[in-house]
A protein has these predicted regions:
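Bacterial N-terminal signal peptides that target proteins for export
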Residues: 1-11
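Buried hydrophobic-core signal for structured, non-transmembrane domains
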Residues: 45-51, 93, 100, 115-119, ...
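Terminal connector regions
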Residues: 103-149, 219-232
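Bacterial N-terminal signal peptides
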Residues: 9-20
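Short acidic, flexible loop segments centered on an aromatic residue
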Residues: 53-75, 174-192
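Beta-sheet-dominated interaction scaffolds and their linkers
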Residues: 26-52, 150-166, 201
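Sec/Tat signal peptide C-region and signal peptidase I cleavage site
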Residues: 20-26
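Intrinsically disordered, low-complexity Pro/Gly/Ser/Thr-rich segments with frequent PxxP/GP/PP motifs
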Residues: 73-106, 193-220
Length: 232
């Protein structure tokens, strides 16, 4: 059964369109900000890493082209973005400024998307160490605004019934900039059943789509004919 006629209107926080926390702490690091926003007039950006531990840490930084295809993330090494320094030692209880710089022109009509990958370089363990040495790896978005158009995401929502009877909700980004979906709710257009909330937290890059399948426990709830139209 197809559910193409949807009453649109995402029920989500403002973060659905790209807002994110200013900083995050992961393992022994804290990082601020959590993304870099570049443009034709602001071709460089900077992030600050802070070491919360009493021992130095070696970190490698690399820029990757960020694409999506069939709902899957694709990262490819790129020279479009310069990262400096590319390898550095983060002092004990110290900090390091990492700069990113655009090395190509911004696209006139569409946002460019990259990822800054920060990887901890594992150090040799002491002879008496018996634990698991886990290297930290973080991925931060780098966005480049179009030079001749306003950056605007535009999500188009559809719903379809899968072969096993579950509802699959798809958000297709018809805009020229990324959207960040935090959560959404699905309900029948007639309002005869309670809305089903979904927490997802995912980026939808321009021209791409993401699909979420509702848990099978909702099959019975969503099987009625009043779900021929949905509000998402």
């Amino acid at each position: 059964m197809s559910f193409q006629h949807c009453i649109l209107g995402i029920v989500a926080s403002a973060a659905a369109f790209g807002l994110s926390p200013a900083s995050v702490q992961a393992g022994s690091f804290s990082i601020s900000p959590l993304r870099a926003d570049l443009s034709a007039s602001a071709q460089t950006g900077a992030l600050t890493l802070r070491n919360q531990e009493a021992a130095p840490v070696v970190v490698q930084a690399q820029a990757m082209l960020w694409e999506q295809a069939d709902g899957q993330e694709q990262l490819t090494p790129t020279r479009d973005v310069l990262v400096n320094p590319a390898v550095f030692t983060l002092p004990a209880n110290g900090s390091q400024l990492v700069r990113v710089a655009l090395r190509r022109p911004a696209d006139a009509q569409r946002e460019l998307t990259y990822r800054l990958i920060l990887t901890e370089v594992p150090q040799p363990a002491s002879p008496d160490f018996t634990g698991l040495n886990v290297a930290l790896r973080l991925s931060l978005p780098v966005f480049v605004a179009p030079s001749a158009a306003k950056a605007e995401p535009r999500l188009e929502w559809t719903a379809d019934r899968t072969a096993d009877g579950t509802l699959a909700i798809t958000a297709r980004n018809a805009g020229n900039a990324h959207a960040r979906v935090i959560n959404f709710s699905v309900a029948p257009a007639a309002g005869s059943a309670a809305a089903i909330p979904q927490d997802v937290t995912a980026y939808v890059l321009p021209g791409q789509a993401r699909t979420w399948t509702l848990d099978k426990k909702h099959n019975e709830t969503t099987s009625g004919t009043d779900w021929n139209q949905l509000r998402v």
